[in-house]
């Protein structure tokens, strides 16, 4: 029987695994908990869908940009002060979100919330590297990922309940309560896990050198870009599904969470399939299979819309397929875009995350800007993203020399 992963001596008394899991859950909860409220926000503030979408798009932009600086800051100053500062900012931003009297204030508060949320996610990954032996770190991340999967499954359901019974501000009150509980636990129980602080971690010359190494490598782009486009394909639905389902296709708000959770379950299924496909077919072919599913999902969605289908029941299966494809594409992208850089692993991971968020920001902005009260824009964008993933997954890895094939 496999022994459970244990923290290295000196950290075993701390609830590290629990904190790691909850830190990682903060990102999906920060988004999924208020998705059902997006159409209501457009009504309350009397603004178009494109303006409301900025509460999502600028969140991912802030999250993506923060990834490039939070890691080096924690390397220099330690994990505790960075995550305490980040959670404090997240708490204040959540309260500001809930108290917002204008859409502009809400957008600004969501941007601040993203900065605080990013600190928790980055520090969780750093703690795994600090406090667990290499042979245990994979098991820790795998187990934590199982916990994290509950957030996008249950978050939209809870968010729909809160919207129906308490209104849109309730989601941000829950965010604030979660941040308060985490802050108390961090201050009371989280030790400093960075025992080898690097005073040069934030020097611009070193950062620039590492960025050049990673961004100049075709190995990085061969897998990071298809993965980022795949994330963009699911962000099509994260940013646009609530408007289309609730406002266009007349889905009751209370049902939205269950429809979205069904779609998210596709991602969990995809990750299971990915492990089996990779063991049998290897990296490149597995990515091609996942990208083919991405294209199929988008093409089926567009075909149904062009055929005149106008019922909310057509969207959850397409979401399931799209997120299932991402469940195949994402693990391949994540591992193969970072593993070629053992000396710049943190930089590669940060750049990969920033690229994901950049694509999500662009997609979210397009989804919001093209919303016209019909299903057509969402279907066209979904099919376009599937096509881009399909092309990128074939063209870019094929350009890697044979000796570098993973």
What is the meaning of each model-derived region?
Residues 65-104:
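Conserved MFS/SLC helix-loop-helix module at the cytosolic interface between two early adjacent transmembrane helices
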Residues 109-150:
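Cytoplasmic helix-loop-helix junction between adjacent transmembrane helices
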Residues 81-95, 286-301:
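Structural signature of the two symmetry-related core transmembrane helices
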Residues 44-46, 78, 99-105, 116, ...:
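Helix-breaking motifs and short loop linkers at transmembrane-helix boundaries and internal kinks
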Residues 105, 135, 142-188:
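Helix-loop-helix hairpin linking two adjacent transmembrane segments in secondary transporters
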Residues 89-96, 104-112, 313-319:
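Paired small-residue
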Residues 334-372, 382:
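A late C-terminal transmembrane helix in Major Facilitator Superfamily
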Residues 2-10, 193-223:
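Juxtamembrane intracellular "pre-TM" segments in multi-pass secondary transporters
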């Amino acid at each position: 029987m496999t022994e459970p992963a244990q923290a290295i001596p000196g950290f075993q008394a701390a609830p590290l695994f629990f904190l790691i899991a909850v830190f990682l859950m903060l990102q999906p909860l920060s988004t999924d908990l208020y998705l059902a409220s997006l159409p209501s926000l457009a009504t309350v503030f009397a603004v178009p869908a494109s303006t409301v979408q900025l509460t999502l798009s600028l969140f991912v932009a802030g999250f993506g940009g923060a990834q490039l600086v939070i890691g080096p800051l924690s390397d220099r100053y330690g994990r505790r002060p960075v995550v305490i500062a980040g959670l404090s900012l997240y708490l204040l931003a959540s309260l500001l979100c809930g108290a917002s009297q204008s859409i502009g204030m809400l957008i600004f508060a969501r941007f601040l919330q993203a900065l605080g949320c990013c600190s928790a996610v980055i520090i969780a990954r750093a703690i795994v590297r600090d406090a667990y032996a290499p042979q245990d770190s994979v098991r820790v991340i795998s187990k934590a990922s199982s916990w994290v999967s509950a957030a996008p499954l249950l978050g939209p359901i809870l968010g729909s309940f809160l919207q129906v019974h308490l209104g849109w501000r309730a989601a941000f009150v829950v965010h604030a309560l979660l941040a308060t509980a985490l802050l108390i636990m961090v201050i009371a129980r989280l030790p400093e896990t960075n025992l080898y602080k690097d005073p040069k971690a934030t020097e611009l010359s070193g950062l620039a050198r590492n960025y050049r190494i990673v961004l100049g490598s075709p190995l990085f782009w061969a897998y990071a870009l298809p993965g980022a486009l795949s994330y963009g394909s699911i962000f099509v639905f994260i940013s646009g599904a609530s408007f289309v389902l609730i406002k266009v296709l007349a889905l009751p708000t209370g049902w939205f969470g269950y429809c979205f959770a069904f779609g998210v379950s596709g991602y969990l299924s995809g990750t299971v399939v990915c492990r089996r496909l990779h063991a049998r077919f290897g990296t490149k072919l597995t990515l091609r299979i996942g990208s083919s599913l991405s294209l199929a999902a988008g093409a089926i969605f567009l075909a149904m819309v062009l055929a005149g289908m106008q019922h909310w029941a057509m969207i959850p299966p397409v979401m399931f397929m799209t997120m299932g494809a991402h469940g195949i594409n994402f693990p391949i992208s994540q591992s193969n875009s970072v593993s070629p850089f053992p000396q710049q692993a943190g930089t590669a991971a940060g750049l990969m995350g920033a690229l994901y968020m950049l694509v999500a920001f662009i997609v979210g902005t397009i989804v919001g800007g093209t919303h016209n009260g019909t299903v057509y824009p969402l279907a066209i964008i979904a099919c376009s993203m599937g096509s881009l993933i399909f092309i990128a997954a074939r063209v870019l890895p094929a350009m890697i020399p044979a000796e570098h094939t993973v």
